Amino acid sequence: MLRMLIAGVLVVFACVNSAEAAGDDKSARGIVERLQNGIFEVLKHAKELGVDGRYELILPVLERDAHIPLMTATVSGPYWREGSKTQKERAIKAFAEMHSALLAALFDSYNGETYKTVKVRETGGKIVLVDSNIIDSDGEPTLVTFATAKIKGRWWVIDVIIAGGISEVKVKRNEFNRLLEEGGLDNLSAALERKKDRLLFGEEKAVR
């Protein structure tokens, strides 16, 4: 039953992504809207899919639209340069899967939330910021700013800032520092893998 539902949602994805309004990777605004569109399509089917179904659909959306390798390298700091190719590949996979599990656990219901792109801001450098309001069912907006960059001919999301706070990448870098100090990339990857499993099994509550 779950496989059939996932297949059905994937059909919806295909229809949505064929529409011009769904966004694309040719602009900063386009990549942000494509990422949000993908997440919101999963959110609309949250209850029926369950956490495992949401995870299976969110993971490819993140891998498609967020530059996971760059984000993993950034949060790992100097330990990234010290890692082998195998260690880096494991860390990238663990980072993507843990964040997908976190979103799958967080987005467990849909109450009519919507999103709206508010502004696209140049920074004078390679990064372009895209401000978006996530609007709840009461009409209350929460500002989410996506940092984007053009890498190898296309746009990627490389960081997220919620309600004008600190960037998620900086938060994660501080959070992961102890793990990296104690055992480098292997220790970080193992911790992320355990966290993913706890989130999917309901042994750990997702925190925004």
For the regions a protein language model found, what residue spans apply to each?
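Sec/Tat signal peptide C-region and signal peptidase I cleavage site
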Residues: C15-G23
